[in-house]
């Protein structure tokens, strides 16, 4: 069972972000890329297309959303918790360690402590970040000099907001942020997501 979007199982406490009260005020929009065919595999990857994060990550995302709102922006989330089975599906399609974590080691996404996101302006238009989400190219790297000055500034804005809120970043993906201690959280599978809340 669930209460207020909260689920507890052996993996710890998870939140459905669209039901997490602190983020349900419009500061965050969710469009999970792997819940639809609109991703690099060309097909849906998720069995459960709800957007989950662990409590620690959800709290830091709340802080980041507050900081973004001060600048007149809000977030669009492309991905959050990615069950281990989904990580295997992505890896089997494109086994590129620069852009995908080897599922044998485990991804921060598969632990519920990573988020892929961008910034939207007050009209809901995504800021220019120089590449699309999941563009597996060096232009996706932080600090890439081949993108426009405006896109570089937008990436720095996102980096500043997320860093101030306590997130770590991945140097090869401008959209990816994670907690600093991801391996301290257990991996989450589709089977574990289906387990009822523990008392």
Where on the chain are the PLM-derived regions?
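Extracytoplasmic cell-surface/polysaccharide-interacting catalytic and binding patches
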Residues: 1-80, 92-172, 180-199
